[in-house]
């Protein structure tokens, strides 16, 4: 399936720094960069104010660049609990901003993105930056790392979108076939039940019209 022209917004979620990017799919595996940047919120501000700023900034990007789909990193953090919570808050705001605009959201783990971009699910940030710079034909490496990560997410979705669509279509086709089979099975059962009922009715009518061989015939009146 051709996804040429698909515009993807990649987001590397974070409350202090949130990487944003927009790319557009070309033919084959060609991807064109549209924009890249980072949204920052002051660490000394109230959580609600930081989330509001993030939501407004990301919303402006979505409105200005009109992406077709959003790709967000699915973060698995085992470190500082506070950092984990802040990132989770940020992800919630990002998904909400997309939902308000009717934009579908796809989430990818860091290893999925690394595998798609470099072929190595354990590639380090330097390797990823080199690869994304080469893939997009950039004159210089995107900075900071959050921006490079956002671009990698967007490119990852461009390359995986055809596979996701084929998988989704296969699932829809299988569900359609399952329903067709259930419908045919239901009709077959109904037909079989109708035949069985007709057979039972016919047998009953036959028995009613013919005396049993064990029944004694009426004796003639001796008079």
Curated annotation (Swiss-Prot):
<dbReference type="InterPro" id="IPR002176">
    <property type="entry name" value="X-over_junc_endoDNase_RuvC"/>
</dbReference>
<feature type="active site">
    <location>
        <position position="12"/>
    </location>
</feature>
<feature type="compositionally biased region" description="Basic and acidic residues">
    <location>
        <begin position="213"/>
        <end position="223"/>
    </location>
</feature>
<feature type="active site">
    <location>
        <position position="73"/>
    </location>
</feature>
<keyword id="KW-0234">DNA repair</keyword>
<dbReference type="GO" id="GO:0008821">
    <property type="term" value="F:crossover junction DNA endonuclease activity"/>
</dbReference>
<keyword id="KW-0238">DNA-binding</keyword>
<keyword id="KW-0233">DNA recombination</keyword>
<keyword id="KW-0378">Hydrolase</keyword>
<keyword id="KW-0540">Nuclease</keyword>
<dbReference type="InterPro" id="IPR020563">
    <property type="entry name" value="X-over_junc_endoDNase_Mg_BS"/>
</dbReference>
<feature type="binding site">
    <location>
        <position position="73"/>
    </location>
    <ligand>
        <name>Mg(2+) 2</name>
    </ligand>
</feature>
<protein>
    <recommendedName>
        <fullName>Crossover junction endodeoxyribonuclease RuvC</fullName>
        <ecNumber>3.1.21.10</ecNumber>
    </recommendedName>
</protein>
<feature type="binding site">
    <location>
        <position position="12"/>
    </location>
    <ligand>
        <name>Mg(2+) 1</name>
    </ligand>
</feature>
<keyword id="KW-0460">Magnesium</keyword>
<feature type="compositionally biased region" description="Polar residues">
    <location>
        <begin position="190"/>
        <end position="202"/>
    </location>
</feature>
<dbReference type="GO" id="GO:0006281">
    <property type="term" value="P:DNA repair"/>
</dbReference>
<feature type="binding site">
    <location>
        <position position="146"/>
    </location>
    <ligand>
        <name>Mg(2+) 1</name>
    </ligand>
</feature>
<keyword id="KW-0255">Endonuclease</keyword>
<feature type="active site">
    <location>
        <position position="146"/>
    </location>
</feature>
<comment type="function">
    <text>The RuvA-RuvB-RuvC complex processes Holliday junction (HJ) DNA during genetic recombination and DNA repair. Endonuclease that resolves HJ intermediates. Cleaves cruciform DNA by making single-stranded nicks across the HJ at symmetrical positions within the homologous arms, yielding a 5'-phosphate and a 3'-hydroxyl group; requires a central core of homology in the junction. The consensus cleavage sequence is 5'-(A/T)TT(C/G)-3'. Cleavage occurs on the 3'-side of the TT dinucleotide at the point of strand exchange.</text>
</comment>
<comment type="similarity">
    <text>Belongs to the RuvC family.</text>
</comment>
<dbReference type="Pfam" id="PF02075">
    <property type="entry name" value="RuvC"/>
</dbReference>
<dbReference type="InterPro" id="IPR036397">
    <property type="entry name" value="RNaseH_sf"/>
</dbReference>
<dbReference type="GO" id="GO:0005737">
    <property type="term" value="C:cytoplasm"/>
</dbReference>
<dbReference type="GO" id="GO:0006310">
    <property type="term" value="P:DNA recombination"/>
</dbReference>
<keyword id="KW-0227">DNA damage</keyword>
<comment type="subunit">
    <text>Homodimer which binds Holliday junction (HJ) DNA. The HJ becomes 2-fold symmetrical on binding to RuvC with unstacked arms; it has a different conformation from HJ DNA in complex with RuvA. In the full resolvosome a probable DNA-RuvA(4)-RuvB(12)-RuvC(2) complex forms which resolves the HJ.</text>
</comment>
<keyword id="KW-0963">Cytoplasm</keyword>
<dbReference type="GO" id="GO:0048476">
    <property type="term" value="C:Holliday junction resolvase complex"/>
</dbReference>
<keyword id="KW-0479">Metal-binding</keyword>
<dbReference type="GO" id="GO:0003677">
    <property type="term" value="F:DNA binding"/>
</dbReference>
<dbReference type="GO" id="GO:0000287">
    <property type="term" value="F:magnesium ion binding"/>
</dbReference>
<feature type="region of interest" description="Disordered">
    <location>
        <begin position="182"/>
        <end position="223"/>
    </location>
</feature>
<dbReference type="InterPro" id="IPR012337">
    <property type="entry name" value="RNaseH-like_sf"/>
</dbReference>
């Amino acid at each position: 399936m051709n996804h040429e022209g698909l515009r993807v917004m990649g987001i590397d979620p974070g409350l202090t720094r949130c990487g944003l990017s927009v790319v557009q799919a070309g033919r084959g595996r060609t991807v064109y960069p549209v924009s890249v940047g980072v949204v920052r919120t002051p660490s000394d501000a109230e959580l609600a104010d930081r989330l509001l700023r993030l939501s407004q900034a990301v919303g402006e990007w979505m409105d200005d660049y009109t992406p077709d789909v959003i790709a967000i990193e699915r973060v698995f953090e085992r470190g500082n609990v506070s950092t984990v919570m802040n990132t989770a808050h940020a992800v919630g705001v990002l998904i909400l901003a997309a939902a308000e605009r009717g934009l579908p959201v796809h989430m990818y783990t860091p290893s999925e993105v690394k595998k798609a971009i470099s072929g190595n699910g354990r590639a380090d940030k330097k390797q990823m930056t080199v690869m994304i710079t080469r893939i997009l034909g950039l004159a210089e490496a995107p900075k900071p790392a959050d921006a490079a990560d956002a671009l990698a997410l967007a490119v990852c979705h461009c390359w995986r979108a055809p596979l996701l669509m084929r998988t989704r279509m296969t699932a829809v086709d299988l569900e359609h076939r399952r329903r067709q089979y259930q419908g045919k099975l239901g009709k077959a059962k109904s037909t079989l039940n109708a035949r069985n009922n007709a057979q039972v009715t016919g047998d009953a009518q036959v028995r009613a019209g013919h005396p049993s061989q064990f029944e004694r015939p009426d004796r003639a009146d001796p008079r």
